Amino acid sequence: MATLRVLPEAQAKVDVFREDLCTKTENLLGSYFPKKISELDAFLKEPDLNEANLSNLKAPLDIPVPDPVKEKEKEERRKQQEKEDKDEKKKGEDEDKGPPCGPVGCNEKIVVLLQRVKPEIKDVIEKLNLVTTWLQLQIPRIEDGNNFGVAVQEKVFELMTALHTKLEGFHTQISKYFSERGDAVTKAAKQPHVGDYRQLVHELDEAEYRDIRLMVMEIRNAYAVLYDIILKNFEKLKKPRGETKGMIY
């Protein structure tokens, strides 16, 4: 039978790590998770996340609306210049020039909320990773019979994986908001006479505000679900066969 020789001092280090991980996990379940559930629930009740009139979220767009007559004259001069100018390189440079307006800032109300939410996303993902590692280290050696507890572990692990995927998506969602808003602002600046582009910027802000509230709810729910399912199945998760077994890895 093949065996792997592990030095006693190496095994001792692994055992210390496992014990420390178990202690941290039990502390999370015993105090940290309930505290975060309460904090995030209170956050959801704050006025900042309960704006009834979303028009109050509008950020000023410092993009002047051009005079139609002057714009028409300017367009005619540009067309005439293009006919006279055969230098394709110069034309390309002209097209790359920025819009004739000052810098357009972010929506400060949205940014302030995201500054509060992003640390919460980072925190819940880190805590979820810790608890997931703890669960994986409770998996016993593979053998026939008495595997009901192992099946419970697998179900909880599947839930944790789904939660992790959802929470990780929040980072992409936030980046996508800024990218889409930047594109909308650029279009509004290049074509200031088109009101739809200006409105699009405000619509994106309102959509992100709703998404931020949903993010906070999902983070709170993640803590609550983890706390509930682990607490209900703690004995099966920690001792799936009624006694402590070695690691699968």
UniProtKB/Swiss-Prot annotation:
Pfam families the UniProt entry points to: PA28_C, PA28_N
Residue numbers spanned by region Disordered: 55-102
Signal sequence range: none
Annotated Gene Ontology cellular component terms: cytoplasm; nucleoplasm; proteasome activator complex
Sequence ranges of Basic and acidic residues compositional bias: 68-98
Keyword terms: Proteasome
GO biological process: regulation of G1/S transition of mitotic cell cycle; regulation of proteasomal protein catabolic process
Family according to the record: Belongs to the PA28 family.
Function: Implicated in immunoproteasome assembly and required for efficient antigen processing. The PA28 activator complex enhances the generation of class I binding peptides by altering the cleavage pattern of the proteasome.
Subunit note: Heterodimer of PSME1 and PSME2, which forms a hexameric ring. PSME1 can form homoheptamers.
Record's protein name: Proteasome activator complex subunit 1
Record organism: Bos taurus (Bovine)
